[in-house]
Regions:
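Second RecA-like catalytic domain
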Residues: 1-246, 250
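A positional "C-terminalness" feature that preferentially activates on distal terminal regions of long
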Residues: 109-127, 132-134, 150-153, 244, ...
Length: 308
């Protein structure tokens, strides 16, 4: 009878864990909706915003319990937000009444589409030396580690190899990321590197099996941002005149007519990222090719220089 009760208890405990796990991932899906799941940071921002609304209603305890959030951590974040608002008000003069109301508002409204893009660019700027790219995009040898059955359409990032600046070997998206059950993005910035623990203990004379490296706190970025935000980490190709343009000839004619004081031309430049690093340079020091961009050059003292 005791054995039967133990078995029943174990089955009930297992069912309870399954239900809790299901509820946990459902809560994550709700918070992942902010920004269409383009950053793990947005998940945190969504939690903080939801907590601020519930705190005003006096239901913060229930919110934390139902959404698997630590109440003490949320209270500290809530207080820190208020402190930062006070610092901004004390150090920035000329704020409008609307801006002051926004800073003093304990509720945190959700960012709009434009603000979401600005936040992604801000995160890209912060982590510009922590860029990762899907291995197949840049033709890295690590791409061969991808499952053969995946083909060109990838439903999730599971076992999809990436290469990351300054991190040797293949890296993978961590299972806790909002990207894990989504199609794998091409370019990311990451906040943390996590190394898995070995599953089996190795003997003294046995070589330890290589550990899997995961990336956490990820944000999807546009590779066209990189050469602007991380210029010092990029190298640039020789300029080529933009095809199909007559800017130079038009500039010469305008110069002859006295309508312009300098010669100008439109060019195309191809940047490469990460190749200039002495340690851990991307693609063996060659860098990863980024999208080409158009620029305007001005002739100054006999030399063409980019117009900023």
């Amino acid at each position: 009878l005791a054995l039967k009760m133990t078995a029943e208890n174990q089955a009930q405990a297992k069912e309870l864990r399954r239900a809790m796990r299901s509820a946990y991932f459902k809560a994550l899906q709700v918070f992942d909706a902010l920004g269409d799941g383009q950053s793990d940071v947005f998940r945190l921002l969504s939690v903080v915003g939801a907590y601020s609304h519930e705190a005003l209603r006096g239901s913060s305890v229930a919110f934390c319990r139902d959404n698997f959030v630590r109440q003490k951590a949320m209270e500290e974040i809530h207080k820190l937000r208020a402190q930062l608002s006070n610092v901004v008000q004390a150090n920035l003069s000329g704020l409008s009444e609307r801006q002051l109301r926004q800073l003093q508002n304990p509720s945190l409204p959700a960012p709009n589409a434009v603000q979401i893009k600005v936040l992604r660019q801000l995160l890209a700027s912060i982590y510009i030396d922590r860029v990762a790219v899907r291995a197949d995009i840049v033709g890295a040898p690590e791409a061969e580690l991808a499952p053969a059955a995946q083909g060109t359409k990838m439903a999730s990032t599971r076992r999809v190899p990436y290469v990351a600046l300054g991190v040797p070997g293949p890296v993978y998206i961590h299972t806790s990321s909002t990207f894990y059950h989504r199609p794998p993005p091409e370019w990311l910035v990451f906040g943390e590197v996590y190394q898995s623990a070995p599953k089996d203990a190795s003997l003294d004379n046995e070589e330890e099996k290589p550990r899997t490296i995961f990336l956490k706190m990820l944000t999807k970025i546009n590779p066209a941002w990189i050469h602007t935000l991380g210029r010092s980490l990029c190298t640039f190709s020789q300029t080529t005149e933009e095809p199909g343009t007559s800017a130079l000839s038009d500039s010469i004619k305008a110069l002859k007519r006295g309508e312009r004081s300098s010669l100008q031309r439109h060019v195309v430049i191809t940047p490469r990222y990460g190749g200039s690093l002495q340690d851990g340079g991307a693609a063996g020091g060659q860098g990863w090719e980024l999208p080409a961009f158009s620029a305007k050059q001005v002739l100054v003292n006999g030399r063409w220089s980019l117009q900023t």
